């Protein structure tokens, strides 16, 4: 059985004079432990598919057909509880980490918030886990960088922070 199965996923954007078909009949299967990368030209629908997987399509867009199955569970049928799956079971890393990070929160605050959303840990336990994750992705001297803001990291280091968020 697939860990993540996307079946005939289509995403449309209803514009003023036309419908834009951003993704049409996408089918993907990912087994447990596998990592999937979507590669393509600008505007080919990579981010749209990623956002559809975790139910983050903004108006005027909508998932017009298909399903996203996490095991046997269709995550689009349970939109109020999507946060249980987003980040805990499925993590996405987009090319530009700047858009994924909140510029007014420190890296540490963002990691703690994400960890505490998914795990019942105290703030201190979440901080310890955060520092371990930052070390794991190659952020040198993670404990001293914990209170830095995203703009204080290079692009590559911001990418590593986003990876640590996905690993939470």
What residues fall within each predicted segment?
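ABC transporter nucleotide-binding domains
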Residues: 1-168
């Amino acid at each position: 059985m697939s860990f993540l199965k996307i079946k005939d996923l289509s995403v449309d954007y209803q514009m003023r004079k036309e419908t834009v078909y951003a993704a049409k009949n996408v089918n993907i299967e990912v087994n447990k432990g596998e990592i999937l990368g979507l590669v393509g030209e600008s505007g080919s629908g990579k981010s749209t598919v990623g956002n559809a997987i975790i139910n983050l399509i903004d108006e005027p867009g909508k998932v017009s057909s298909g399903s996203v199955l996490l095991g046997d569970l269709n995550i689009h049928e349970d939109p109020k509880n999507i946060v249980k799956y987003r980040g805990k079971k499925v993590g996405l890393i987009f090319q530009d980490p700047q858009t994924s990070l909140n510029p007014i929160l420190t890296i540490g605050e963002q990691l703690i918030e994400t960890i505490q959303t998914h795990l019942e840990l105290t703030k201190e336990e979440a901080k310890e886990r955060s520092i371990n994750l930052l070390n794991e992705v190659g952020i040198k001297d993670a404990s001293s960088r914990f209170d830095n803001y995203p703009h204080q990291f290079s692009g590559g280091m911001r990418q590593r922070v986003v990876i640590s968020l996905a690993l939470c």
